[in-house]
Amino acid sequence: MALKDTAKKMTDLLESIQQNLLKAEKGNKAAAQRVRTESIKLEKIAKVYRKESIKAEKMGLMKRSKVAAKKAKAAAKKPAKATKVVTKKACTKKTCATKAKAKPVKKAATKTKAKVTKKVRSTKK
């Protein structure tokens, strides 16, 4: 079997499994049985596909076409999106005046120490 034939068989089996799964979900017992048997067939064909794909890769049959290679390179070369740079606008008389009023100057708070009272224990009894 060729690699293309094996891939075609796998896609056909997957489609039939999918259709039978929909029927089995609705309660069709025969469809559920078909899903089980087809999944076993799929396993066997998948093993064959793995072997054939490894052989094809070693022989150089699975190289990308030039069109696919160019698309991959173009996708890799695209730069990441630039982050937005927010520029501050120049102050006009109205905007600067309102900003100055909005931010009042804070005065430094004076620190006051609370008096700590210590309990004195008498040692006399």
From Swiss-Prot:
* Gene Ontology molecular function: DNA binding; structural constituent of chromatin
Record keyword DNA-binding present: yes
Does the record bear DNA damage in its keywords?
no
For this UniProt record, give its keywords in alphabetical order, as a comma-separated list: DNA-binding, Repeat
* Pfam families per UniProt: Hc1
Q: What does this protein do?
A: Might have a role analogous to that of eukaryotic histone proteins.
Family membership noted in the UniProt record: Belongs to the histone H1/H5 family. HCT subfamily.
Spell out the protein name for this chain. Histone H1-like protein HC1
Q: Which organism is it from?
A: Chlamydia muridarum (strain MoPn / Nigg)
Task: Print the organism lineage.
Answer: Bacteria, Pseudomonadati, Chlamydiota, Chlamydiia, Chlamydiales
